[in-house]
A protein has these predicted regions:
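Glycine-rich phosphate/pyrophosphate-binding beta-alpha loops
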Residues: 67, 71, 124-140, 204
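ATP/nucleoside-binding phosphotransfer catalytic cores, i.e., glycine-rich phosphate-binding loops
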Residues: 111-112, 117, 143-146, 153-230
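Short acidic/glycine-rich loop or secondary-structure boundary segments that cap or lie
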Residues: 72-74, 117-119, 131-134, 159-163
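Glycine-rich nucleotide phosphate-binding loop and flanking beta-alpha elements
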Residues: 25, 129-131, 196
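Catalytic core of DAGKc-family lipid kinases
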Residues: 1-125
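Gly/Ser/Thr-rich active-site loops/lids in small-molecule metabolic enzymes
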Residues: 82-90, 130, 139-159
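Glycine-rich, charged/polar anion/phosphate-binding loops
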Residues: 50, 93-96, 105-112, 133-139, ...
Length: 230
């Protein structure tokens, strides 16, 4: 996140080499980058640059996700020493402690000219197939270089039947239940409670009464393994 911000702020076009060393590695998972450090380093040395989109959230940049609501706080609130010791499990345990604090957030979104408004339990504007290592989007509907975000909004289920329906829709990646809104868009304008915090690539971002989120098409180049069939 900081590297991308630095490059774009400087107007540089330097290819980025990425070694996944985090607890969840959503970004690497979506790009199918090796999680083995030596293999990742080899990809940087022997690979080739491939162009990818990034997001701009107001005045900040993000590589793969801007999210709000349930369980998003755990990504930045979990102490680093706990992440180091427990890895992805640390996020799960932290998420459990958040259960009593979960609430709906009233949000209005203008998505490429269409308006969506309601009380949402969770929302994500992403360019990734994996969010938090728990929620996985359909790879067939996610292209990290097509100039579009995937937007997923989850309304709070009101009974056990709706909970089951919502979980089933997320697991099947069909997104066809009443609690879910799934769209693709290049630009989103958001109106929300300015006290509602956001998470950008796992880092805390203060709330905004109004903020515009824009997909920057092919804004970065990332080193990837060469296509041997090309």
């Amino acid at each position: 996140n900081e590297t991308i911000t630095g490059l774009l702020s400087a107007g540089a076009d330097t290819p980025i080499g990425y070694i996944p060393a985090g607890s969840t590695n959503d970004f690497a998972s979506s790009l199918k980058l090796p999680t083995n450090i030596l293999k990742a380093a080899q990809t940087i040395v022997e690979g080739e640059p491939v162009s990818y989109d990034v997001g701009r959230f107001g005045g900040r940049y993000f590589s793969y996700v801007a999210s709000f609501g349930a369980f998003t706080r755990s990504s930045y609130a979990t102490p680093q020493n706990v992440k180091n010791a427990l890895g992805h499990t640390a996020y799960v345990l932290s998420g459990i402690t958040e259960l009593s604090q979960i609430r709906n957030e009233h949000v209005k979104m203008e998505i490429d000219g269409q308006t969506v408004e309601g009380d949402f339990l969770f929302g994500a504007i992403c360019n990734s197939t994996s969010v938090g290592g728990i929620l996985t989007l359909d790879p067939k509907q996610v292209d990290m270089g097509d100039g579009l975000f995937e937007i997923l909004l989850v309304r709070a289920p009101e009974n056990l039947g709706e909970i089951h329906e919502c979980i089933q829709a997320l697991q099947s990646q069909k997104y066809n239940c009443a609690m879910l809104t799934f769209r693709s868009a290049q630009k989103v304008r958001i109106f929300a409670d300015p006290e509602m915090p956001w998470t950008l690539d796992g880092e805390k971002e203060d709330g905004h009464e109004t903020v515009e989120v824009e997909n920057l098409h092919h804004a970065i180049r990332l080193m990837q393994k060469k296509d041997e069939d090309a």
